[in-house]
């Protein structure tokens, strides 16, 4: 039994049975079921995320992400005392997901406990586990916006955390755009942290020392010594000292090289006895065999060691079984093979000579071939690269990881090119199946071994553990809440869908024992998403580079909706913005549905005064005014429930079946009525190539027809929103333009909706132009949906520097030019240039504004005159990419006024602060606890619906009895939301012909109605 919302055409619609279809090569419609597990095989492209970060974070004047901007903002946050939200009820509750992790570049098993470890995400902070990673707790003493790159624990127990990674920083080749803040230390097992003196970048630029610290290592011999590989060299540091012990590697004292080491230290490994070091600096490799006192450059042009003298980046590993055995894996740094494996090498004589053990991986190869950094479209060894030696007395083995992990074994005295064994898969099991024991999330960045010989891997999906040297894996992400969301959507019950970086489109259905559990619906990067507020089984989502998917059953099956552009092309925008408009009662609709009832329609009444004449005569039948009839919608798979306002007359021929009786048989009804289809729904998707709209988002008996409504897009689309009445579509661009497309309520045909057509009815106007991407658009819904378009529109603007990050126009729907969006971002001067990514105007009091920024959420209760920080409750200072509020009436949803926040690093949050304060009382005043019980259609032939009004959210019981009192069927539903026209469907196909009574109970209240079953 399902509870559905009805749409009356004042209006109610119920969904008929539906299925998924696509068009095959012959143009025929065919069923297309795609299991979730197949979508999980789709890989991500890391450069796409970089592209998007640059579009919304870059300095509005230079077009680049500037390190100085980030530093000045972070310093201001620490030094300036911010006003807190005046109403302390603005508290945020984490919704998770608590079973999905985020990008992890550092894992540290702690020495004081065999089951304690710390893991660090590039956004979201540090987390600690005391049960081997089974569950995690946030270390609140560490700033969540710092990029964690490496962790180490000294022999004296001190824990160090390095920040900033060369694979994340803005080096001009495309990265996430953030550099580090230096080196931090904790002397209390991670409870509190402080910046180590002289280890903060100053000035805060990419070339400043400590801008990136890719790797730190504890000295195995000296319990007070830490080795640091930064962007400008390799250092030794004594715990507690105020200055560096400058290592000889940073000077010119290298035995066979006079060129100073000023390139970023990419990787370091130290033997367990502390004597052998191997260091990668830029494209040079150095080895020390005396505890780091002296180094030798081993891959110079005339070294003849067998190593290449140039490469893009590299990882190193010293055997955990034999210090003389070491490994090096390299990545191509430029050209068509950029990001592919350049070669993997092994040495068995302490690094004197090296042998190739894996050649350059096949460029453009298939996923089944050995290509550890290839994701099916591009290679990204520059981004994800891991190499580790397996501690094993019985075999000498290594694991090389990137997109997937591969194992290699040394089987002879002289290493050579031998087979590599793939040890994990990047796709999960299918729905309802147990987790795959070999699943590890793609994009593998780091590894760590604990004292029990367990291997941990840090990935874009969090932490994984193997207890058998990579043979099988366990996901360790419970409460490791570090997911990076791009966009979110919700349904009337508060269930949430969100698009994430490299973690799919995630669905939180709030069911089961863990309401923070999320299910992945499609693989790769999930970006834009929407959910119907009237048919919540319908959900829309997109994948990186433009592909749009849809589900009609809340994620049980997901199918391709439409390819509006060449799908998956690297030239497409990384993200796809989308906007769904739903109006259940559009008085301006020009869509009319033909209606001709069957002669046995239960709604027809035959005039009693018609004289029965010989066969062939015509009689008049009518549907009386006030009747509620059901009609199939035009080109959308739902049923209109229409209340007849005046009698509708139809005409029918009849014949006598027996000349001596009045038994009649009627032929088809002759006339057709045309009924206005007031419920109207539109779905828009925006790309650089153009903006597309369909009026058939719920069509499944074929492919929804999309129209190109605008092809003048100046740049990437970064935001979209409809006006409440659906007459205007607002489109924001990376270039800083805001465009209004108008007259959708006058455009109903293909010609009227297709740009370039002679009958094109839409009007395009640029209504704002400025610096910084338009990251969000919010329209004032406080005036309802059918009283003309709301003139009041707010926008948020991304990018560091500049001003006016939140702007409002009071005439956005009618203005004919630019200049009406006024700056309402009245924050302390230090924060005027903070990027804003999202904005909400409260449905009940539009002077209440919430802004999602680079560092959390801000609140204004006076239309932007003043602002205060609103990171209360469980919210922290992380980027908030999406803020959305439930705008539907409180009697139709259970989450009216609730605001949801999608963060890029700490998952999803919600606040009930703006929940309509009198919603329950209002409902109770207007609607009895239980009222207006109806069965339709009545008589019933097979399926039917029971409609009722419910004054409060409650558990309900439904009983169906035969006329003689026998119980035929019983149903129970928990926590049915308050509202009018609640609906329960039932199937009477197996009922005998006759009369029945339906009884509905809510606590001590009950109501009943009769219905008849016929055939």
Where are each of the predicted segments found?
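Hydrophobic membrane-insertion alpha-helices, especially the h-region
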Residues: 9-20
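Beta-propeller blade termini and top-face loops
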Residues: 19-20, 25-915
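Ser/Thr- (and often Asn-) enriched beta-sheet segments in non-cytosolic proteins
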Residues: 192-194, 294-296, 353-355, 557-559, ...
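Low-complexity, Pro/Thr/Ser/Gly/Ala-rich linker/spacer regions in secreted
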Residues: 914-928
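C-terminal outer-membrane/trafficking sorting elements
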Residues: 924-936, 940-1015
């Amino acid at each position: 039994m399902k509870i559905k919302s009805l749409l009356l055409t004042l209006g109610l619609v119920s969904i008929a049975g539906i299925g998924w279809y696509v068009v095959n090569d012959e143009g025929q419609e065919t069923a297309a079921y795609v299991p979730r597990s197949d979508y999980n095989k789709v890989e991500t492209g890391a450069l796409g995320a970089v592209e998007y970060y640059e579009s919304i974070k870059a300095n509005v004047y230079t077009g680049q992400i500037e390190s100085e901007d980030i530093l000045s903002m972070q310093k201001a946050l620490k030094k300036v005392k911010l006003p807190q939200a005046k109403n302390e009820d603005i508290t945020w509750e984490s919704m998770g997901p608590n079973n999905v992790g985020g990008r992890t570049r550092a894992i540290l098993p702690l020495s004081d406990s065999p089951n304690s470890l710390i893991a660090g995400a590039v956004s979201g902070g540090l987390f600690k586990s005391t049960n081997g990673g089974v569950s995690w707790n946030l270390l609140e003493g560490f700033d969540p916006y710092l990029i964690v790159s490496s962790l180490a624990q000294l022999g004296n127990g001190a824990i160090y955390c390095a920040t900033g990674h060369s694979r994340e920083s803005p080096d001009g080749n495309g990265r996430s755009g953030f550099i580090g803040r230096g080196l931090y230390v904790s002397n209390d097992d991670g409870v509190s942290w402080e910046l180590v003196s002289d280890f903060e970048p100053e000035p805060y630029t990419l070339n400043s020392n400590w801008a990136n610290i890719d790797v730190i290592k504890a000295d195995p011999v000296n319990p007070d010594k830490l080795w640091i590989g930064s962007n400008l060299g390799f250092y030794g540091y004594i715990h507690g000292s105020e200055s560096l012990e400058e290592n000889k590697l940073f000077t010119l004292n290298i035995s066979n090289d006079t060129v100073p080491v000023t390139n970023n230290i990419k990787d370091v490994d130290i033997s367990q006895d502390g004597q052998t070091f191997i260091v990668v600096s830029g494209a040079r490799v150095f080895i020390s065999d005396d505890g780091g006192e002296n180094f030798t450059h081993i891959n110079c042009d005339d070294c003849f060691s067998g190593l290449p003298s140039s490469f893009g980046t590299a990882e190193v590993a010293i055997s955990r079984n034999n210090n003389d055995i070491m490994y090096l894996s390299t990545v191509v740094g430029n050209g068509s093979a950029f990001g592919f494996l350049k070669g993997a090498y092994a040495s068995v004589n302490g690094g004197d000579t090296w042998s190739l053990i894996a050649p350059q991986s096949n460029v453009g190869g298939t996923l089944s071939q050995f290509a550890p950094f290839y994701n099916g479209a591009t290679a990204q060894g520059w981004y994800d690269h891991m190499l580790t030696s397996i501690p094993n007395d019985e075999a000498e083995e290594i694991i090389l990881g990137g997109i997937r992990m591969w194992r290699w074994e040394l089987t002879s005295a002289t290493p050579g090119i031998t087979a590599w064994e793939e040890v994990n898969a990047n796709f999960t099991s299918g729905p309802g199946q147990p987790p795959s024991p070999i699943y590890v999330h793609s994009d593998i960045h780091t590894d760590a071994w604990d004292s029990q010989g367990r291997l941990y891997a840090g990935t874009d999906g969090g932490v994984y553990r193997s207890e058998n040297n990579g043979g099988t894996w366990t996901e360790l992400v419970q409460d490791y809440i570090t997911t990076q969301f791009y966009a979110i959507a919700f349904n009337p019950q508060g269930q949430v869908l969100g698009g994430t970086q490299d973690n799919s489109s995630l669905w939180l259905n709030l069911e089961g024992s863990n309401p923070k559990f999320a299910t992945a619906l499609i693989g790769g990067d999930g970006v834009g998403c929407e959910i119907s507020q009237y048919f919540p089984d319908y959900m829309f989502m997109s994948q990186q580079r433009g592909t749009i998917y849809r589900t009609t059953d809340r994620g049980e099956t997901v199918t391709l909706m439409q390819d509006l552009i060449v799908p998956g092309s690297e030239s497409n925008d990384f993200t796809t913005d989308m906007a769904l408009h739903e109006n259940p009662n559009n008085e301006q609709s020009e869509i009319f549905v033909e209606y001709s009832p069957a002669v046995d329609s239960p709604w027809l009444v035959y005039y009693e005064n018609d004289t029965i004449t010989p066969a062939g005569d015509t009689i008049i039948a009518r549907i009386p005014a006030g009747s509620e009839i059901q009609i199939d919608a035009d080109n959308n798979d739902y049923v209109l429930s229409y209340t007849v306002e005046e009698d509708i007359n139809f005409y029918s021929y009849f014949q006598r079946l027996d000349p001596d009786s009045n038994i009649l048989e009627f032929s088809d009804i002759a006339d057709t009525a045309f009924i206005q289809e007031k419920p109207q729904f539109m779905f828009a998707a925006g790309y650089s190539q153009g903006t597309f709209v369909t009026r058939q988002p719920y069509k499944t008996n074929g492919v929804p027809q999309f129209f190109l409504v605008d092809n003048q897009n100046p740049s990437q689309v970064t935001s979209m929103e409809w006006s409440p009445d659906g007459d205007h579509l607002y489109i924001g661009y990376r270039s800083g333009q805001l465009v209004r497309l108008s007259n959708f309520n006058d455009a109903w045909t293909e010609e009227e909706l297709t740009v370039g057509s002679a009958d094109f009815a839409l009007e395009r106007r640029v209504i704002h132009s400025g610096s910084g991407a338009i990251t969000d658009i919010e329209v004032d819904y406080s005036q309802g949906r059918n009283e003309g378009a709301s003139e009041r529109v707010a926008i948020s603007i991304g990018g560091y520097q500049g001003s006016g990050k939140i702007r409002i126009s009071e005439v956005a729907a009618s203005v004919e030019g630019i200049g009406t969006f006024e700056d309402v971002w009245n924050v302390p001067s230090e924060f005027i240039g903070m990027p804003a990514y999202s904005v909400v105007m409260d449905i009940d009091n539009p002077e209440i504004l919430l802004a999602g920024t680079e560092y959390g959420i801000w609140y204004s209760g006076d239309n932007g005159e003043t602002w205060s920080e609103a990171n209360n409750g469980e919210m922290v200072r992380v980027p908030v990419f999406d803020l959305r509020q439930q705008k539907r009436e409180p009697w139709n949803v259970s989450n009216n006024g609730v605001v949801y926040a999608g963060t890029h690093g700490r998952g999803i949050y919600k606040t009930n602060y703006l929940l309509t304060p009198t919603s329950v009382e209002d409902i109770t005043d207007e609607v009895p606890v239980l009222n207006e019980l109806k069965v339709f259609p009545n008589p019933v032939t097979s399926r039917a619906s029971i409609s009722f009004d419910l004054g409060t959210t409650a558990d309900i019981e439904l009983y169906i009895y035969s006329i003689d009192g026998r119980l035929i069927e019983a149903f129970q539903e928990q926590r049915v939301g308050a509202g009018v026209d609640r609906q329960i469907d039932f199937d009477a196909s197996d009922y005998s012909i006759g009369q029945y009574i339906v009884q509905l109970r809510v606590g001590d209240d009950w109501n009943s109605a009769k219905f008849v079953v016929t055939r």
